[in-house]
């Protein structure tokens, strides 16, 4: 049901990401939408009115985590300092083979708590036991694009994954008052043969859902695709017609200028995961070049096992610093652009049209940062302070779909201590074998 409480945020600094301006305003939320932004807003019906004091706070759109595997919080810290393929083959995949639906449920809740407490209001997920992830999303109040990851090197496994994905989409698309949407998620071009990808494309068109896929993450992947198909991952997927469907492409680390133009032409959402790419030594995505070319670039954390946190404020800062040092240009990926990648541009990359901006008529997905901490003084430039000084712990209040799901750092729907206990118990057992 739509939240019936009217919320009025008074006297706050509102970030306008269309004009890249910060204005002192009130925000009125009615139902699940922002109904008015302005000065000295008055509400006649005060019976169902909640007033939030926005002084010493800045309101910005909820952060959007464009790529993660949220239940992988269960494997955080279990194995680090390994190359991607060693890490997957020797640690992660063996541990994941022991996963149960209940494990994924508690691991997802742990990740969702972490995301809410650091200001994320929407995430795009690819994993297993997705019914359990959906239940966690439904229970928590967060917004998500959910997809069941599919690996099809074994045709029987691919067929099973596609059937489960279709069943999941038909069951969950648009549920939780529209907070849950879905996608088809072939893992990557090196784990999904062409004929399988063609089946996925056909089903995505039939179901009218996007495709969520890892692309060009490592040099090993590039070598595998070149050896098998004589081309690069982006060109390979284009030749199959995959980009004719709305595509969310995670990583896109190793792409050339021609491939960047392909991404632009098809409006592929390129999700940059800077901390995961650095930690696994996958490489540095040419984000500045992509943005200059007009590619829709969002940000993601990847799973907590390869990051190792889900803090999007850290991620937008890492993205900016990485582009600056790799190009030896301090002007690369400035503060305003990195914030946009985590909000408005990130929403466009995922194909979401009603979130990512504080705008009348948009869904009320809003976070309030407490700017009365020492890291926000002196108040020279709020965009610079958010991009380069803020921390996830500065998030004071989180509103999703017009409902307050965290206020003054306290979750309103979830039992954080129980979630930490259950996730810890299960994570330790999974890795121990």
From Swiss-Prot:
Q: CDD domains per the record?
A: ATZ_TRZ_like
What Gene Ontology molecular-function terms does this entry list? 5'-methylthioadenosine deaminase activity; metal ion binding; S-adenosylhomocysteine deaminase activity
Q: Which Pfam families match?
A: Amidohydro_1
Stated EC number for the protein is 3.5.4.28, 3.5.4.31
Binding-site positions, Zn(2+): 67, 69, 214, 302
Q: Which cofactor does it need?
A: Zn(2+)
| Top EC group | hydrolase
Please list the residues that bind substrate.
96, 148, 187, 217, 302
- The chain's coiled-coil residues are none
Q: Does the keyword Hydrolase apply?
A: yes
Q: What does the entry comment about cofactor binding?
A: Binds 1 zinc ion per subunit.
InterPro entries the record matches? Amidohydro-rel, Deaminase_MtaD/DadD, Metal-dep_hydrolase_composite, Metal_Hydrolase, MTA/SAH_deaminase
The keyword Iron is assigned to this record: no
Write out the catalysed reaction: S-adenosyl-L-homocysteine + H2O + H(+) = S-inosyl-L-homocysteine + NH4(+); S-methyl-5'-thioadenosine + H2O + H(+) = S-methyl-5'-thioinosine + NH4(+)
Q: What keywords tag this UniProt record?
A: Hydrolase, Metal-binding, Zinc
This chain's function reads: Catalyzes the deamination of 5-methylthioadenosine and S-adenosyl-L-homocysteine into 5-methylthioinosine and S-inosyl-L-homocysteine, respectively. Is also able to deaminate adenosine.
**Family of this protein:** Belongs to the metallo-dependent hydrolases superfamily. MTA/SAH deaminase family.
Identification of the protein by name: 5-methylthioadenosine/S-adenosylhomocysteine deaminase
């Amino acid at each position: 049901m739509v939240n019936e409480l009217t919320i009025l945020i008074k006297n706050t600094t509102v970030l306008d990401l269309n004009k890249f301006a910060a204005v002192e305003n009130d925000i009125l939320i009615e139902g699940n939408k922002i109904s008015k932004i302005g000065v000295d807003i008055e509400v006649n019906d005060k019976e169902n009115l909640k007033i939030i004091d926005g002084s010493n706070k800045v309101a910005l759109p909820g952060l959007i985590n464009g790529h993660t595997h949220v239940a992988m919080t269960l494997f955080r810290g279990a194995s680090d300092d390994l190359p991607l393929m060693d890490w997957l083959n020797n640690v992660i995949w063996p541990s994941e083979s022991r996963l149960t639906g209940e494990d994924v449920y508690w691991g997802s809740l742990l990740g969702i708590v972490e995301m809410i407490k650091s200001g994320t209001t929407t995430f795009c997920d690819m994993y297993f036991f997705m019914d359990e992830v959906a239940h966690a999303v439904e229970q928590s109040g967060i917004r998500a694009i959910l997809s069941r990851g599919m690996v099809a090197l074994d045709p029987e496994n691919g067929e099973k994954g596609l059937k489960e994905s279709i069943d999941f989409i038909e069951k969950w698309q648009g549920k939780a008052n529209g907070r849950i949407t879905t996608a088809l998620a072939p893992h990557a071009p090196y784990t999904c043969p062409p004929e399988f990808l063609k089946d996925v494309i056909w089903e995505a068109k039939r179901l009218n859902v996007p495709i969520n896929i890892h692309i060009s993450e490592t040099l090993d992947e590039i070598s595998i695709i070149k050896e098998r198909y004589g081309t690069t991952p982006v060109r390979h997927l284009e030749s199959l017609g995959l980009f004719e469907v709305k595509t969310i492409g995670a990583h896109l680390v190793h792409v050339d200028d021609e491939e960047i133009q392909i991404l632009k032409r098809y409006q592929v959402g390129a999700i940059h995961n800077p901390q995961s790419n650095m930690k696994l030594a996958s490489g540095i995505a040419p984000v500045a070049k992509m943005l200059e070319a007009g590619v829709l670039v969002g940000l993601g954390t990847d799973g907590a096992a390869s990051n190792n946190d889900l803090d999007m404020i850290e991620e937008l800062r890492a993205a900016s610093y990485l582009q600056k040092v790799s190009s030896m240009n301090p002007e690369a990926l400035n503060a305003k652009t990195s914030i946009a990648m985590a909000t408005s541009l990130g929403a466009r990359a995922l194909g979401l049209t009603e979130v990512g901006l504080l705008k009348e008529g948009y869904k009320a997905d809003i976070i309030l940062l407490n700017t009365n901490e020492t890291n926000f003084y002196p108040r020279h430039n709020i965009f610079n302070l958010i991009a380069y000084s803020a921390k996830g712990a500065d998030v004071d209040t989180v509103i999703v779909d017009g409902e307050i799901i965290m206020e003054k750092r306290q979750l309103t729907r979830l039992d954080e201590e129980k979630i930490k206990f259950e996730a810890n118990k299960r994570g330790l057992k999974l890795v121990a074998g």
